[in-house]
Amino acid sequence: DLVVVKGTTNGTITDFEGGFTLNVPSNSVIVVSFVGYKSQEISVAGRTDLTVTLKEDTQLLDDVVVVGYGTQKKEDLTSAIATLSPKEVLKSPGGITDALQGSTAGVNVSGGKIRIRGTSSITGSTDPLWVVDGIIDASGNIPNDNEIESIQVLKDAASCAIYGVRGANGVIVVTTKKGAEGKPKVSFNAYAGFGSNTSKVDMLNPYDYAVYVNELYYNSSDANAIANGTWNKTVPTGVANPSNPLGSTDWWDEYFSNTNYQKYDLSVSGGSKYASYRIGATHADNDDKMHTEDVKVDNIYANVQGTVGRFTYGGRIFANYSRTNGFTGASLMNTLQTPSNLPVYNEDGSFFLTGNNGRDGSDLVNQIWFLRNEKLRNRSISALGSIFGEIKIFDWLKYRLTYTYSFARNNDATLIPEHDLGTANGKQAYNSQTTTKGGSGHEIIENLLTFDKTFNDVHTLSGVVGVVSEKFDGWSTGISGRSNEYASFGPESRFPDSQNITSSQYNEAYFSYLARVMYSYNSKYMITANFRADESSKFKKGNRWGYFPSFSVGWRVSEESWMKDATSSWLNNLKLRATLGWIGSANAVGRYDYQSVVVTDNRYYTFGPNQINPEGTASNASAPLIENFANPDLSWETTRDAGVGFDLDMFNNKFSLVFDYYN
């Protein structure tokens, strides 16, 4: 904290505990200030002991925006970046995803999918890139909503091009809370709630359903037979009959049920002048709306950072363990197609087994049986570790090296017991288990050189240059088998009959150069240029490099003297912006599409009797097969993004408007 006598240069700095001593005249006014807090003026009035409490300046905190590989003053931004308040996230039961809907222009959320300014790939993924505490592709590493400090949405090429191929669909940048100098602070939050499906499909009751089915049969019968009076009006076997209803079932209510959830999170933070920390844990327990799953999730996390002289260091760890137990296999569509006059259970409590659906003779299986009997089990663990070291070469020049590694392991299993549901498609004379195991790893190494220099108090030049490498690897194994002995989850050896084993493995890599330069004249005229060069292993040599530049300019009209003279009483900020950029994407291309892929499969070969010898039978043998042919011309998808816009703040920042037009 800085303490000065108002109107003078007489001042001092507080100590570690916030105390200070300053010799002043008895009628002085002192000004106490600290970065991120509102300054406070206090009249001494002859006193020798003062207690001062500063309030957080939320407006000032909003003035610094996290951008790609750095931060920037909001007033100097020339690109389309939206900020979402963490308070809005806490108000939304669905977290960040739901909070973005309707609160951020150009962002559409539907079915849990986020789309920033529409679709940017023809066939590939259109999900945005998540960057958490500077770590790319880390959407699953946010401990809980209470740990969020800031959220920025990068929407245009001018802001996303610095991420190259990874930022083709927009970028969501999340910064989590860090520890601060001071005594340990403990925070605990507990949540509990319930939910229900309020949007219900209105279905016909049994009588109306039977009438409509009979009408269907009447209207679809042979016209000549009806004209000649030979049409048989007897209801076909198995078809709903108004005079003989079997029951009255609301299949929607049978399929869905209420949701109950609870969540707890605990955090501890603190530190000294040399190091600070924030550690915590979260537990969540949730069952879904189809009484099929109970999901439990636990995570632990820690953030540590410190400064010694010109050297700054830090690290972040996050680990997550989730387990799901429940049932699966039921189809909502098939459930709703089940006639409402059919019951779920027989009088003895056993499941009612249906035959055809009463309309076209198609097999109809009691879907509620699957909700009670087809078992699902999932176990997954993921972890991330990141460390960095930063040295201040000069006051205006820093070098940072960051290493991040994350991995995930999963074990999924599905068990279907022996059953006979009364139809050809509803019979299985054995117990079957399918197990899928997999793992993945992701390594990131970043070398960044950042600079920020001001000349003659009005010319500011800042930016970053760097080299980034990424490696991905993964594997999966699937085993399915049958057993007439075991009807519960167990090792694969319990299900030895008709075993089928599949496996796969992959590797993927990127190597990138990046640069951003921003020039500002007195925070009035701004220009920013970004450049990213990406090399991807998805393409053949010769096509692997993609080059993606972007440019943006800004003009703060409100800082012009002629504008200030006319509007100073009500206009706080008016900034015009224009952007142009190109972003690349490799999402639509498979890892090995540029090469011929050979697989082993069973095919008919002329090793024995064949078509040449009609009296024999073709031989079915396992042999190599080209699954797809090489396409060496595959290259990058490229999106060109151009836009103009303005930012307007009026009436002491009580009214704000952001407008963007883009193509």
In which residue ranges do the predicted regions lie?
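Short proline/glycine-enriched turn/loop segments at secondary-structure junctions
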Residues: A161-G164, L332, D565-T567
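Extracellular/periplasmic, surface-exposed regions of secreted and cell-surface proteins
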Residues: T126-D127, Q262, V297, N303-Y321, ...
